[in-house]
Amino acid sequence: MFFFNTKPIVFLVVLSVVATFAAATPAMLARGGGSSCAPSTSLKCCDHVGTFSEVSPYINPLELVGVIAALLGLVGGLFTSVTLALTCSGIDIGGSCNSQTVCCENVVFNGLVNVGCTAIDIL
């Protein structure tokens, strides 16, 4: 019979399993032409994303005045191509988003309406 110390072998097996799982951990990467958020923007998870005409049916009439004022201040009145994001919440590191992930420049009404957004896809 062969008697030998199995502790080093068990250690190497456990170490290789841990290294395999660490290497297989998914990373959050921007894809689809988007980029990660710039320092002046914030990462949000939003229910409705689009131009003013696309998201206007989802805007509460009481919030509409603030949205238009923010758009006018952002681009001098030419806001047809600016992307808006509605009903947004912040995303923490390791968090998930079941709606559209965006990076937004301006936040109006504490995240309810976001102006100057860029949609990104997170892997």
Curated annotation (Swiss-Prot):
Cysteines joined through disulfide linkages: C37-C103, C45-C97, C46-C88, C104-C117
Keywords: Cell wall, Disulfide bond, Secreted, Signal
Superkingdom field: Eukaryota
GO molecular function terms attached to this record: structural constituent of cell wall
Leader sequence segment: 1-24
UniProt cross-references to SMART domains, sorted A to Z: HYDRO
Major localization listed first in the record, in broad terms: secreted
Record's subcellular location: Secreted; Secreted, Cell wall
Cellular component GO terms, alphabetical: extracellular region; fungal-type cell wall; membrane
Entry function: Aerial growth, conidiation, and dispersal of filamentous fungi in the environment rely upon a capability of their secreting small amphipathic proteins called hydrophobins (HPBs) with low sequence identity. Class I can self-assemble into an outermost layer of rodlet bundles on aerial cell surfaces, conferring cellular hydrophobicity that supports fungal growth, development and dispersal; whereas Class II form highly ordered films at water-air interfaces through intermolecular interactions but contribute nothing to the rodlet structure.
Quaternary organization: Self-assembles to form functional amyloid fibrils called rodlets. Self-assembly into fibrillar rodlets occurs spontaneously at hydrophobic:hydrophilic interfaces and the rodlets further associate laterally to form amphipathic monolayers.
Family of this protein: Belongs to the fungal hydrophobin family.
Designated name of the protein: Unclassified hydrophobin 9
